[in-house]
């Protein structure tokens, strides 16, 4: 069965006829710089704690996050990755008349909403407004916009689920774009899983607004930026009453001891954060330029650590060839109905790895 998410190395290895370790994975949008040394040190230091249950309130991690975001502890809830917290956001959205979802959307949003029988209304991005004149030398800007479909019920009876930066396009919306919806909707859930990739002077987080708007929920992931997908840790920021309701219904000890220790360390790792912010823009730009020069490929500009690419060649076929001939895995977009088989997504990796991808794509597109 084809994977729904990126990072399925077992499937990729079976397709390529090699071991999972031989796969160069561009399908999962994980930073190649991590995990930080601080995470490894924290895990080693807490191995002796495996004999005890975790602190159910995760006070050490929560207190550190409070310092980072200038909030009191009751406004923050650590979770088993942002996916677990998305489930509870889906539970709240399903209580409303409708849940408006900006599409194309991460497949897990549908899971979380359908789990509680939410009525989903899609609001598609206008991807066709992009400048496609690559041949004229005009840079293709990511100016994609969205116009919300009018709900069948009033806005005050409906909820909105959006991510910023947007996955899979990489579009970053200014906070002023989203703020008006906080006055209109009963609930606004903003997934900021990729916001950490932007330095403080560029990020557009709505966390500073959460105390003003009790209908605002922010989801944050520590998976992508800190390269910790195997540990499963993230957190939600929302009104204490809402988070307390979630806590009463979730499983106990959702975050294991080692994940909590690593998370506590990395959010204080200023050196890793700074090096990541310095690394990403030039490396992403080099990959963007390389993709732009390959016939039949049209990348979108991105504020995140990945690039969405439109392809003249069916991407399912391209993915198979990359695996079988080069042991490289890209993320097809078949799980995004609005995109289908003419788009793929690639993570930004090291310059050497990016060059390997570009050479393989050039070979496959020019020889086909």
Report the location of each language-model feature.
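N-terminal "arm"/small-domain region of PLP-dependent enzymes with the aminotransferase-like
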Residues: 1-52, 158
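PLP-dependent aminotransferase class I/II
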Residues: 36, 215-293, 298-300
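Short, conserved charged micro-motifs
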Residues: 37, 314-321, 353-356
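Phosphate-binding glycine-rich loop
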Residues: 60-99, 116
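Substrate-binding/gating loop at the entrance of the active-site cleft, primarily
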Residues: 80, 101-118, 253
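Active-site phosphate-binding strand-loop segment of PLP-dependent enzymes
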Residues: 121-130, 141-200
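Conserved PLP-binding catalytic core of the aspartate aminotransferase-like
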Residues: 281, 291-326
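PLP-dependent enzyme catalytic core of the Aspartate aminotransferase-like
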Residues: 324-325, 335-368
């Amino acid at each position: 069965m084809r994977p729904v998410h990126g990072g399925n190395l077992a499937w990729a290895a079976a397709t390529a006829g090699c071991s999972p370790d031989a796969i160069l994975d561009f399908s999962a949008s994980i930073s190649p710089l991590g995990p930080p040394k601080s995470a490894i040190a924290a895990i080693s230091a807490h191995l002796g704690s495996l004999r005890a249950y975790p602190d159910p309130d995760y006070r050490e991690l929560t207190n550190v996050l409070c310092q980072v975001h200038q909030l009191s502890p009751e406004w923050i809830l650590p979770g088993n990755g942002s996916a677990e917290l998305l489930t509870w956001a889906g539970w709240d959205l399903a209580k409303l008349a409708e849940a408006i979802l900006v599409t194309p959307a991460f497949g897990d949003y549908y899971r979380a909403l359908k789990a509680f029988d939410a009525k989903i209304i899609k609001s598609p991005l206008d991807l066709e407004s992009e400048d496609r004149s690559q041949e004229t030398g005009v840079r293709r800007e990511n100016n994609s916009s969205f116009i919300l479909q009018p709900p069948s019920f009033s806005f005050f009876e409906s909820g909105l689920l959006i991510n910023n930066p947007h996955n899979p396009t990489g579009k970053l919306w200014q906070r002023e774009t989203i703020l008006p919806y906080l006055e209109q909707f009963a609930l606004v859930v903003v997934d900021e899983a990729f916001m950490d990739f932007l330095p403080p002077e560029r990020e557009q987080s709505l966390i500073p607004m959460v105390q003003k708007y009790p209908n605002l929920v922010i989801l944050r992931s520590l998976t992508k930026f800190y390269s910790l997908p195997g540990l499963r840790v993230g957190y939600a920021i929302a009104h204490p009453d809402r988070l307390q309701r979630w806590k009463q219904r979730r499983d106990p000890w959702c975050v294991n001891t080692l994940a909590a220790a690593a998370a506590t360390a990395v959010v204080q790792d200023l050196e890793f954060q700074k090096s990541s912010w310095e690394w990403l823009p030039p490396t992403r730009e080099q990959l963007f330029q390389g993709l732009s020069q390959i016939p039949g490929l049209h990348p979108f500009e991105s504020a995140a650590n990945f690039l969405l690419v439109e392809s003249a060649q069916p991407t399912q076929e391209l993915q198979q060839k990359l695996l079988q001939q080069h042991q490289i895995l890209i993320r097809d977009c078949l799980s995004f109905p609005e995109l289908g088989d003419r788009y793929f997504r690639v993570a930004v990796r090291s310059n050497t790895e990016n060059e390997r991808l570009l050479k393989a794509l050039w070979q496959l597109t020019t020889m086909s």
